[in-house]
């Protein structure tokens, strides 16, 4: 409808439910996405792609690809919807856990999640070694990539909701309630929220951005 070629791959999911995607190690998922982006660039003849992702798909997964796997050379824009950037738990809890448990216990926690092929759930906790590796060593953004983070204050997974935002150069952080104060979208609601959709479309083509028409949505607000 808008003239974009849209690709939506599912990788690294549960072995018995492969369409339940991206539950495995985020590093492995990022490598799969890297290969897929290369295929898209070859098929379309484009030099770069725009990435739109929700939750893990807007936060640690694409950011790992961009910062660790050379994605900054192939990504023009990253539009992140309710991304789990700084963890899905309060920072105070993460700080307490970091100060309270040993590295050996950290490793044991990682191994337990990895064995069940749900490593990404542990990796998105604010106190995880993965989160510290990715976000704890200076800026995660890269020159040449335009970042937009769209988050709402009623997110019930990324808590507090400010964990989603990146306070770094080149990032536009948008709070849904600034233009649409009566939008009560939860974390899952972001995947079909009409107001969020409008903001994402504007981020894709900022030169032709349109005013957001706030829509009241039953069961969301």
Please place each PLM-identified region on the residue numbering:
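Short, glycine/charged-enriched secondary-structure capping and boundary segments
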Residues: 1, 22, 65-68, 93-96, ...
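Alpha/beta-hydrolase active-site loop signature
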Residues: 13-15, 85
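Acidic helix-start/capping segments at beta-turn-to-alpha-helix junctions
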Residues: 16, 53-57, 219-220
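C-terminal catalytic-base region of ester-bond hydrolases, centering on the histidine
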Residues: 100, 140-221
């Amino acid at each position: 409808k808008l003239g974009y070629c849209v690709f939506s791959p599912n990788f690294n999911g549960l072995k018995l439910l492969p369409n339940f995607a991206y539950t495995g190690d985020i590093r492995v998922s990022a490598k799969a996405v890297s290969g897929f982006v290369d295929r898209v660039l070859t098929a379309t003849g484009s030099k770069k792609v725009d990435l739109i992702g929700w939750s893990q798909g807007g936060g640690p997964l694409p950011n790992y690809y961009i910062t660790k796997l050379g994605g900054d050379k192939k990504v023009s824009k990253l539009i992140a919807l309710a991304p789990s950037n700084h963890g899905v738990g309060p920072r105070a809890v993460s700080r307490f856990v970091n100060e309270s448990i040993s590295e050996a216990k950290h490793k044991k926690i990682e191994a337990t999640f990895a064995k069940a092929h749900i490593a990404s759930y542990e990796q998105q906790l604010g106190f995880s070694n993965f989160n510290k590796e990715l976000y704890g060593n200076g800026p995660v953004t890269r020159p040449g990539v335009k970042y937009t983070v769209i988050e709402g204050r009623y997110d019930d997974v990324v808590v507090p909701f400010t964990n989603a935002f990146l306070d770094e150069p080149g990032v536009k952080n948008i709070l849904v309630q600034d233009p649409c104060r009566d939008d009560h979208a939860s974390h899952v609601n972001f995947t079909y929220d009409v107001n969020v959709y409008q903001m994402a479309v504007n981020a894709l083509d900022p030169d032709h951005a349109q005013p957001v028409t706030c829509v009241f949505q039953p069961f969301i607000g």
